[in-house]
Amino acid sequence: MTMTTNIFNAIILGIVEGITEFFPISSSGHLLIFTNILEMKNNEIKILNTIIQTGAALSILLHFKEKFVIFLEQIFICKQITKKNDLIYHHIILGNIPIIFIGLCIYQYIKYLSNFYSIIYALIFGTILLILTEISKTKISSNKNIETPQILIIGIFQCLALWPGFSRSCATISAGILSGLKQSKSVEFSFILSVPIFFGASVLDVINNFYDISINNIPMLFSGFLSAFITSNIVIKRCLNTMKNCSLIPFIIYRSILSIIIYLFFMH
């Protein structure tokens, strides 16, 4: 492929990532579909996907910058905890412990799950979880404040994000609601929780794929990053407003249709 084609492909993938990352519909599933449509090489895909996810993570960081400033202040200068700033560092660290531990243990095996067979099953199981969440959310007494047991439950469910196609948002938002958290709070916490994981995974992937990065790839990687960052910035606010109160049924239907499309067009 020419450099122009690579840059074009990277921009497309960045847009796909920016649109799909924040909804419970699996950005990894969509990226696999588009990398197949664009006929991209395997050695290009891994590092590019990592870079564009970093672009999406940066947009979350900027959107919640006040909370992350408090997070850093609580860690490094021991800022006094108030009702306004809450135990933000405690929430973020505790919520990410499960996926850090599990992720490091199975990191070398995750690549074997990046195929259409695995992604279809992940989409199906994630859809079932959304159905259970939608049915249960009117019956569960919601709590505005997040407690330690809920953080642990959400953190454990977040490990399902290691399965490409499941959707991190699907796992964490569902876990929050099922554990008794208001949907609006579940959505916000899901977004905030993702930032350290995205950046941590990016560093790990860059280290492990360092020799696949060449000077010729830099324009492609930068284009993908910028595309994902810009798209994410456009989408994130609208997504937050939509996801905080909406029904999960549209996402259940969408995931079901996506599973059928993958089966019919990419597995036959």
UniProtKB/Swiss-Prot annotation:
GO terms for molecular function: undecaprenyl-diphosphatase activity. It comes from Buchnera aphidicola subsp. Baizongia pistaciae (strain Bp). The keyword Cell division does not apply. Signal peptide: none annotated. It comes from the Bacteria. It catalyses: di-trans,octa-cis-undecaprenyl diphosphate + H2O = di-trans,octa-cis-undecaprenyl phosphate + phosphate + H(+). Bacitracin is thought to be involved in the inhibition of peptidoglycan synthesis by sequestering undecaprenyl diphosphate, thereby reducing the pool of lipid carrier available. It is a multi-pass membrane protein. GO terms for biological process: cell wall organization; peptidoglycan biosynthetic process; regulation of cell shape; response to antibiotic. Belongs to the UppP family. HAMAP family: Undec_diphosphatase. The gene is uppP. GO terms for cellular component: plasma membrane. Its main location: membrane. Catalyzes the dephosphorylation of undecaprenyl diphosphate (UPP). Confers resistance to bacitracin. This is Undecaprenyl-diphosphatase. It is an enzyme of class 3 (hydrolase). It is found in: Cell membrane.
